[in-house]
Amino acid sequence: MAFTGKFEMESEKNYDEFMKLLGISSDVIEKARNFKIVTEVQQDGQDFTWSQHYSGGHTMTNKFTVGKESNIQTMGGKTFKATVQMEGGKLVVNFPNYHQTSEIVGDKLVEVSTIGGVTYERVSKRLA
């Protein structure tokens, strides 16, 4: 399934618990709770540019090639080396503290992250 598109967050589950386990402070968790997140994905074969635009003008962009080590930035702002894999149509990556999958389901981008038994799910609807 092609990932290229622009997606706006419409729902999330277990936000507070997941962010606390990541070590994000309560004030930052509260501040970010109502952020409108727009994710833009450009896919060219195995090459991806994955950008998340947050309320207030902050943007985080990761560029990676499936199967090759890349510098990846986490939700918490830390950068590390990781290899993104494609497994059954899902992008899969192991961050230092959590595991994440991303997939297209119908016209939705579904991102699932797991840490310490807590699963955070963010669902975004396709805008373009």
Swiss-Prot record:
The keyword Membrane applies. It comes from the Eukaryota. It holds the Pfam family Lipocalin_7. One of its GO terms (biological process) is negative regulation of cell population proliferation. This is Gastrotropin. Belongs to the calycin superfamily. Fatty-acid binding protein (FABP) family. Forms a beta-barrel structure that accommodates the hydrophobic ligand in its interior. Can bind at least two ligands per molecule, however, the stoichiometry is debated. InterPro entries: Calycin, Fatty_acid-bd, ILBP. The modification N-acetylalanine is found at residue 2.
